[in-house]
């Protein structure tokens, strides 16, 4: 921080002492009715908020930069700073300046960071706001990564154990607002930081916070236990360290009211399907690739939730499909009952819509950030639980019955809030009046004193009017001068001598008298005591609610799940989805399948064309050829989304669906340059393809679109062919392989389980009509020129392209008078006899030991050898 070298003023010394303890935070320093920032902080705040940068006198030293804003508008300004990635420390005056002996005492009263905020101006109620920590531990010769994450506004707290190479994808999947790492691990994480979400703030912490013993002690203290076995996290050392780091960071940032965080769990890969970044992006599960918003995503179609808790959970469900058949069946049965009995579903939906965000309101109550109106709504929401419970206990399916039984009625708490908080309570606590009459005897007495005294003031007003003959005389009040008698200047000659002047105005003067002073003291004293007492009573009520946090959180979790199941059912009924049969076999049958998002975008004049899909022992790898724009990519995405929905527990857009359980969905669809990190389209494509080949199993679903198009025709086709063989021979995964390399159709005759399909078209004399129907057999034409025409390419370009194509089909073409070899002669022939050196090299390959990467390297060597033999 830049600061003048000479003597600072007492207040500035106080500021610098606090700033020294919080160097990484923008320090908001309360001065009167403003929060001020100084020095470099002021420059940052001025720039970030577009407010005036001014200067303040600093004792005998020169003036210092200063920028600030009114304290009553601080929440909005702080929200803007945090959204820009800043961390903010709030330093308040903690004593009355009029009673201060010397400099006013100030303390840090709040710290707000991207990962630690309770403000509605920052949070989206349909999104979680995660704070995540990463820890690395050595276990023998290997390094294990542990992750933990928490949403302080909902008390969701989880840990996970990862391989180091899984860290980047985990962080991108979670997309936390803030990530905590050890300073010593900064360099280790540097290579993958470019893969982290760009809007995520990375906070480096002292290394000592990442000790195992330290973490265990912090966790035991938080959960008031000697062992963490009951939470199922006992053996996850790295994850426990990360969780301990989060709790220490919360304590360090003065989040010392954490008793509402009552549980911690672990993410188990055995229970949930892992979806990597490419799959989430390519399937457009949460956001569309077009603009990154929810518009055009699966979530937009599926989310019919009635409250924020359900909205947050349905996001997690879609991003973490289930892998346990029993869990999937329980959800599907519950959805079926909700779908078949729509009156029940509508009744439940009505109750859900009247329940506010219990999780986030609870966190604000427990941290004393709530307002009276919100607490009243909290009590009203809890009062709906008996009605919801009664409705669910009328159901017949196991899961809905269990959810109904899990709901905990809280009549005592509801009655307490009803008795304590006034129905007309607003957002402000400054002037009191939000604690209900009859709740507390002392408060009622103080209010009676104030009210009686105010009645006496009216009597004084009438008496003084009669005594002075001034009919316009008024007894009034303001916060600066208290109670006073106001008399217009035209009546000043009638003012008695015992009137004591308090203030002179342009058209009037204000006075007081002994009787007015007496009752003013009674009123102000009673009102001041009332406000203090109301604040204490509201604080005590908040503590009582926080003590029942575990029960409230149980109810919140149940309500969120009910909301998601009802949402699935509403969508299934409206859009004609069917109940999928999910089993442990490898068969995958979809009859009349539809893309859930695209079908909603189609007009009634151009309805979505449904397609069938079959994987069984005879069909494991489907090669799909056909023209661009004919629906190949949509067909691939449709298959992935149907499987994802089925294993999330939703009905699916099809006439019939049998889903053999899938452990992971992999996609390689489309391509985009990652130029910021120096990666080309083809390198990105190969990285993604390599990840698929190294991680897929026979239980996986592979959706591959146009593999190899980022390089030359010969290289691309060689890679596509080789990958197909490797998937067939070594993995055995159910695979949809869309390609423009029509030569791959040859694989059907060579490999058992490889079957050709194509996207059909109708050719007329004038144009080509894309039917978007996937049928058996290979295609022999890509119709690229027709696609170019539809895109609006100039007519002369289209005509010339047809001439060139005709020449190619005759095996030679004349371009500017130069004879060109046929297209076949420019592509590598996989069946042509090579010279002796090429033959020898091929014969010496040990195919049983080749990895996918080795195969690509050897292919490159063979290509170089072949080109050298051709004199090129």
Curated annotation (Swiss-Prot):
Gene: mutS
GO MF assignments: ATP binding; ATP-dependent DNA damage sensor activity; damaged DNA binding; mismatched DNA binding
Biological processes, Gene Ontology terms: mismatch repair
Functional description taken from the UniProt entry: This protein is involved in the repair of mismatches in DNA. It is possible that it carries out the mismatch recognition step. This protein has a weak ATPase activity.
Source species taxonomy: Bacteria, Pseudomonadati, Chlorobiota, Chlorobiia, Chlorobiales
Name of the protein this chain belongs to: DNA mismatch repair protein MutS
Organism: Chlorobium phaeobacteroides (strain DSM 266 / SMG 266 / 2430)
Superkingdom of this protein's organism: Bacteria
Binding residue positions for ATP: 626-633
HAMAP family, A to Z: MutS
Listed Pfam families: MutS_I (PF01624), MutS_II (PF05188), MutS_III (PF05192), MutS_IV (PF05190), MutS_V (PF00488)
Swiss-Prot/TrEMBL keywords: ATP-binding, DNA damage, DNA repair, DNA-binding, Nucleotide-binding
One GO CC annotation: cytosol
InterPro entries hit by this protein: DNA_mismatch_repair_MutS, DNA_mismatch_repair_MutS-lik_N, DNA_mismatch_repair_MutS/MSH, DNA_mismatch_repair_MutS_C, DNA_mismatch_repair_MutS_clamp, DNA_mismatch_repair_MutS_core, DNA_mismatch_repair_MutS_N, DNA_mismatch_repair_MutS_sf
Family membership: Belongs to the DNA mismatch repair MutS family.
NCBIfam families in the record: mutS1 (TIGR01070), PRK05399.1 (NF003810)
């Amino acid at each position: 921080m830049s600061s003048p070298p000479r003597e600072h003023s007492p207040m500035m010394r106080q500021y610098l002492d606090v700033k020294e303890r919080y160097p990484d935070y923008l320090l908001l320093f309360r001065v009167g009715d403003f929060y001020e920032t100084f020095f470099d902080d002021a420059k940052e705040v001025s720039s970030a908020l577009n407010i005036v940068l001014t200067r303040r006198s600093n004792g005998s030293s020169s003036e210092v930069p200063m920028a600030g804003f009114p304290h009553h508008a601080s929440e909005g300004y702080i929200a803007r700073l945090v959204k820009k990635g800043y961390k903010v420390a709030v330093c308040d005056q903690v004593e009355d300046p009029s009673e201060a002996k010397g400099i006013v005492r100030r303390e840090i009263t709040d710290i707000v960071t991207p990962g630690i905020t309770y403000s509605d101006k920052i949070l989206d109620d349909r999104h979680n706001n995660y704070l995540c920590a990463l820890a690395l531990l050595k276990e023998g010769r290997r390094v294990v990564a542990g992750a933990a994450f928490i949403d302080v506004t909902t008390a969701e707290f989880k840990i996970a154990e990862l391989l180091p190479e899984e860290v980047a994808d985990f962080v991108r999947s979670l997309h936390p607002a803030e990530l905590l790492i050890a300073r010593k691990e900064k360099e280790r994480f540097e290579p993958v930081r470019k893969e982290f979400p760009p809007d995520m703030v990375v906070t480096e912490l002292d290394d000592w916070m990442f000790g195992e013993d330290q973490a265990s002690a912090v966790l035991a203290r938080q959960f008031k236990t000697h062992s963490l076995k009951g939470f199922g996290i006992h053996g996850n050392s790295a994850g426990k360290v990360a969780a301990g780091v989060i709790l220490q960071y919360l304590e360090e940032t003065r989040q010392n009211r954490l008793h509402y965080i009552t549980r911690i769990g672990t993410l188990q890969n055995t229970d949930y399907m892992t979806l990597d970044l490419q799959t989430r992006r390519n399937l457009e599960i949460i956001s569309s690739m077009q603009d990154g918003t929810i518009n055009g995503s699966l979530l937009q179609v599926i989310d019919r939730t009635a409250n924020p808790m359900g909205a947050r959970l349905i996001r997690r469900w879609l991003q973490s499909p289930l892998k346990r058949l029993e869990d999937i069946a329980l959800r599907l049965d519950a959805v079926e009952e909700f779908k078949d009995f729509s009156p029940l579903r509508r009744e439940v939906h009505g109750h859900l819509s009247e329940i506010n965000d219990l999780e986030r309101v609870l966190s604000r109550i427990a941290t004393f950030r709530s307002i009276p109106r919100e607490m009243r709504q909290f009590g009203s929401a809890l009062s709906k639980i008996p009605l919801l419970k009664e409705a669910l206990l009328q159901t017949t399916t196991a899961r809905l019955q269990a959810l109904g039984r899990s709901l905990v009625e809280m009549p005592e708490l509801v009655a307490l809030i009803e008795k304590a908080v006034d129905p007309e309570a607003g957002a402000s606590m400054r002037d009191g009046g939000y604690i209900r009459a009859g709740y507390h005897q002392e408060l009622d007495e103080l209010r009676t004193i104030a009210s009686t005294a105010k009645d006496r003031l009216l009597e004084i007003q009438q008496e003084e009017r009669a005594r002075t003959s001034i009919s316009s005389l008024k007894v009034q009040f303001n916060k600066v001068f208290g109670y006073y008698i106001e008399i217009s200047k035209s009546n000043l000659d009638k003012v008695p001598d015992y009137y004591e002047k308090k203030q002179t105005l342009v058209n009037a003067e204000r006075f007081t008298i002994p009787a007015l002073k007496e009752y003013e003291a009674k009123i102000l004293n009673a009102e001041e005591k009332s406000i203090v007492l109301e604040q204490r009573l509201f604080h005590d009520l908040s503590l009582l609610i926080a003590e029942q946090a575990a029960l409230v959180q149980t109810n919140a979790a149940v309500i969120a799940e009910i909301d998601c199941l009802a949402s699935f059912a509403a969508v299934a009924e409206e859009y004609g989805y069917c109940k999928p049969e999910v089993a442990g076999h490898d068969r995958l049958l979809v009859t009349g399948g539809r893309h859930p998002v695209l079908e909603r975008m189609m007009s009634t004049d151009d309805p979505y064309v449904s397609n069938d899909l079959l994987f069984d022992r005879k069909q494991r790898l489907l090669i799909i050829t056909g023209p661009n724009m004919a629906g190949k990519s949509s067909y691939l995405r449709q298959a992935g989304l149907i499987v994802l929905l089925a294993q999330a527990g939703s009905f699916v857009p099809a006439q019939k669906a049998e889903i053999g359980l899938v452990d992971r969905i992999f996609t390689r669809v489309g391509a985009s340059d990652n130029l910021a990190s120096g990666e080309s389209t083809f390198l990105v494509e190969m990285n993604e393809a390599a990840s698929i080949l190294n991680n897929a199993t026979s239980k996986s679903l592979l959706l591959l679109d146009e593999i190899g198009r980022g390089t030359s025709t010969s290289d691309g086709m060689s890679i596509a062919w080789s990958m197909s063989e490797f998937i067939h021979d070594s993995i055995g995964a159910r695979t949809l392989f869309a390609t423009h390399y029509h030569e791959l159709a040859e694989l059907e005759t060579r490999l058992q389980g490889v079957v050709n399909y194509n996207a059909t078209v109708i050719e007329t004399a004038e144009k080509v009509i894309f039917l978007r129907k996937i049928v058996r057999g290979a295609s022999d034409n890509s119709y690229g020129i027709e696609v170019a025409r539809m895109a609006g390419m100039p007519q002369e370009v289209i005509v010339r392209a047809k001439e060139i194509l005709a020449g190619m089909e005759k095996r030679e073409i004349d371009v500017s008078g130069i004879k060109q070899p046929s297209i076949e002669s420019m592509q590598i022939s996989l069946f042509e006899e090579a010279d002796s050196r090429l033959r020898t090299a091929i014969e010496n390959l040990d195919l049983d030991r080749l990895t996918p990467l080795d195969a690509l390297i050897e292919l490159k060597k063979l290509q170089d050898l072949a080109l050298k033999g051709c004199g090129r």
